[in-house]
Amino acid sequence: MYTKQSSAKIQELKSPALSIKIGYLDDDFRIFSLVSEEEREFQPHYHSFHKLLFFESGNVSYYVEGETYELQPFDLVLVPAGEVHRPVIHSSLPYRRLILYLSPAFFEAYKKESVDLFHSFSLCSARASHVLRFSDLLESRLYTPLQELSQ
């Protein structure tokens, strides 16, 4: 649950001295599945690329830029490049997710006057909501093709 106290803690974590840049991306995109089966603490961090995370299972909160989201299966988390984020795993249940990294150059290469693939990421900051909630896999038409690509 998001509280003023957790907001203050997140603002503290967003300090450049306390958040680190991690990960790298040598191509336009990278897609993979991850499972964390033990409790693990993730440090606040950011990337130079955009991150799309499909949450599959676990008991996880996700912090992005001062907001806390209690994830539910099939949630889609959008994290634009440069935004501080981290998951918090609340139990030893396996934390399963499908991750897609996208370079800023990827979006630029496909940008046209009538089409802006980056639009969904742009809305995150404007609406202060980084999670799209789907009730099932059928509602999320992106999940199945991405899962197939990750194998």
Question: Locations of the language-model features?
Answer:
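N-terminal regulatory/effector-sensing and dimerization cores
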Residues: 28-123
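A hydrophobic/aromatic-rich effector-binding and dimerization subdomain
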Residues: 2-30, 88-150
